[in-house]
Amino acid sequence: MAGLGVTELLIILAIVIVLFGASRIGDLGGAMGRGIREFRRGVRDEDATAPTDASKNESK
């Protein structure tokens, strides 16, 4: 993982907690999770509504 060990990751995590605070990190994580969920839902809906190549050829 790009040469990062456990110690380096813990140091980075500690710096992030100091900069943003624990509650802010939870809010950011929740917002990121909601964004990813909405993106996946949008991709899935787009795939369901998009006609396939086979159905395009049958209608011609």
Swiss-Prot record:
Signal peptide interval: none
GO biological process: protein transport by the Tat complex
Gene Ontology cellular-component terms listed: TAT protein transport complex
Subcellular location(s) per record: Cell membrane
Ranges in coiled-coil conformation: none
Keyword Ribonucleoprotein: no
Transmembrane segments: 1-21
Annotated membrane topology: Single-pass membrane protein
Keywords for this protein: Cell membrane, Membrane, Protein transport, Translocation, Transmembrane, Transmembrane helix, Transport
GO molecular function, one term: protein transmembrane transporter activity
Family designation: Belongs to the TatA/E family.
Subunit structure: Forms a complex with TatC.
PANTHER family found in the cross-reference section: SEC-INDEPENDENT PROTEIN TRANSLOCASE PROTEIN TATA
Name assigned to this protein: Sec-independent protein translocase protein TatA
Organism from which the protein derives: Herpetosiphon aurantiacus (strain ATCC 23779 / DSM 785 / 114-95)
Lineage of origin: Bacteria, Bacillati, Chloroflexota, Chloroflexia, Herpetosiphonales
